[in-house]
């Protein structure tokens, strides 16, 4: 599980574009806390802290504690908006969570031991179909990443979700199929050779008819 962190915030008494622009001029950005059957809470958070959290990785899989108006609220970042040109954060949505909360999160998949995969040694390419997987997981036990060992994989082999060991209490959001995470694809040269061989075999078969 990723380490939690504390984020200090101020209540927002005004909303709207004018208020948001004023916040940004003062080094803050607008945000909202919602969920848990409570009224949404409009807050302002530090632009600098949010910028580094977003670009540091793991932002949407790490539970945070927001200190605002004398209260401590556990949250999980659910969404954020970036400036389309400069990639600067403009707004953040936080979901209220507790130790009993179960949430949907996208967790990255990491692959190890590529050098121990015969298919890759022969020139095969690791074709990643899904860089992350949506999981249903307790909010206090979100894994930083899922890991798969590529040792022994050959060209043409596939990695399915069933091959990845999920932590206790964690399930994949997609339950109706054993979806593919990655494959070991043949290199372009080998594909060309195989196609040429197949073509030659077809010609021989025709000649023999």
Curated annotation (Swiss-Prot):
The terms under GO molecular function for this entry are:
5S rRNA binding; structural constituent of ribosome
Q: Which UniProt keywords apply?
A: Ribonucleoprotein, Ribosomal protein, RNA-binding, rRNA-binding
Q: Where is the composition biased (Acidic residues)?
A: 200-209
Instruction: Give the residue ranges for region: Disordered.
Output: 190-209
Signal peptide extent: none
Which GO cellular component does the record give, naming just one? cytosolic large ribosomal subunit
Q: Does the keyword Ribosomal protein apply?
A: yes
Gene Ontology biological-process annotations: translation
- List, alphabetically, the Pfam families matched: Ribosomal_L25p, Ribosomal_TL5_C
Q: List the disulfide bonds.
A: none
Q: Does the keyword Metal-binding apply?
A: no
| Assembly with partners or alone | Part of the 50S ribosomal subunit; part of the 5S rRNA/L5/L18/L25 subcomplex. Contacts the 5S rRNA. Binds to the 5S rRNA independently of L5 and L18.
**Role summary:** This is one of the proteins that binds to the 5S RNA in the ribosome where it forms part of the central protuberance.
UniProt lists the family membership as follows: Belongs to the bacterial ribosomal protein bL25 family. CTC subfamily.
The protein, known as: Large ribosomal subunit protein bL25
């Amino acid at each position: 599980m990723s380490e939690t962190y504390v984020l200090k915030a101020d209540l927002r008494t005004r909303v709207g574009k004018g208020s948001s622009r004023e916040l940004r001029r003062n080094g803050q950005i607008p945000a909202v806390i919602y969920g848990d059957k409570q009224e949404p809470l409009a807050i302002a958070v530090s632009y600098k802290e949010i910028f580094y959290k977003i670009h540091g990785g793991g932002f949407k899989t790490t539970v945070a504690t927001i200190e605002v108006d004398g209260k401590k609220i556990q949250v999980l970042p659910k969404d954020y908006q970036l400036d389309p040109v400069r990639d600067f954060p403009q707004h953040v949505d936080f979901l209220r969570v507790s130790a009993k909360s179960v949430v949907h999160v996208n967790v990255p998949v990491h692959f190890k031991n590529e050098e121990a995969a015969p298919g890759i040694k022969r020139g095969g390419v690791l074709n990643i179909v899904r860089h992350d997987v949506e999981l249903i997981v307790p909010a206090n036990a979100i894994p930083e990443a899922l890991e798969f060992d590529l040792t022994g994989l050959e060209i043409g082999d596939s990695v399915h979700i069933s091959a990845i060991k999920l932590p206790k209490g964690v399930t994949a959001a997609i339950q109706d199929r054993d979806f593919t995470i990655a494959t070991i694809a043949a290199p372009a040269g080998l594909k060309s050779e195989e196609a040429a061989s197949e073509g030659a075999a077809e010609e021989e078969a025709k000649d023999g008819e």
